[in-house]
């Protein structure tokens, strides 16, 4: 009888692990045990993955002061900067257009960058790409409070930089949507 229970236990464990593997392979992001969110970034035109961006609480002197955004990206244009934003919708379809506009839960209708509380909450620091086409430099997004509030949105990287203003061009002048990752519920 003991062998029967061991066999049943092993079978159940196999089913659970297989289900977990299936779920993680089909999610656009992963939730780590240490309170991290890993967003898989893809080219909006080719749908080819260019790496991941990890989002985790930024703790300084024992207090949370926003979220730490750590890119692990490759095959990007060398020596460039790119506007980075949280967009409203959890979709990267239609060349990134389905992501909607910048996440603005307070309806400020202002693009003032990541350090001004009077603008879009989805305004993040720019992404800097190294000479070898990788982006690995972490940045802090002080307006973001939790991983949970990011669920149901998307993370977007634009073709150009971001001047954190609506002038001379709206939304920081970042231009076309280039790389996107869904942050699903």
UniProtKB/Swiss-Prot annotation:
Q: What reaction does this catalyse?
A: 2 superoxide + 2 H(+) = H2O2 + O2
- What enzyme category does the UniProt record give? oxidoreductase
Q: What is this protein called?
A: Superoxide dismutase [Cu-Zn]
**Per the record, what is one GO cellular component?**
periplasmic space
Superkingdom, taxonomy of origin: Bacteria
> Main localization of the protein?
periplasm
| Co-factor binding comment | Binds 1 copper ion per subunit. Binds 1 zinc ion per subunit.
Query: Briefly, what is this protein's role?
Result: Destroys radicals which are normally produced within the cells and which are toxic to biological systems.
Q: Where does Cu cation bind?
A: 85, 87, 102, 158
- Disulfide bond residue pairs: 92-180
Q: Where does Zn(2+) bind?
A: 102, 111, 120, 123
């Amino acid at each position: 009888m003991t062998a029967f229970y061991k066999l049943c236990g092993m079978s159940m464990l196999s089913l659970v692990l297989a289900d977990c593997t299936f779920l993680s392979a089909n999610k656009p992001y992963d939730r780590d045990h240490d309170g991290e969110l890993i967003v898989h970034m893809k080219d909006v035109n080719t749908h080819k993955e260019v790496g991941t961006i990890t989002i985790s609480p930024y703790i300084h002197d024992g207090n949370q002061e926003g979220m730490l955004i750590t890119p692990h990206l490759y095959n990007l244009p060398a020596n460039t900067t790119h506007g980075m934003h949280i967009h409203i919708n959890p979709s990267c379809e239609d060349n990134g257009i389905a992501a909607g506009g910048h996440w603005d839960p307070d309806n400020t209708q202002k693009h003032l960058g990541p350090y001004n509380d009077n603008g879009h909450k989805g305004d993040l620091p720019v992404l800097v790409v190294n000479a070898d086409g990788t982006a690995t430099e972490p940045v802090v997004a002080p307006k973001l409070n939790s991983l949970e509030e990011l669920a149901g949105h998307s993370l977007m990287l634009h073709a150009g930089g971001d001047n954190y203003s609506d002038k001379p061009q709206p939304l920081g002048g970042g231009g076309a949507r280039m790389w996107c990752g869904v942050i699903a519920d």
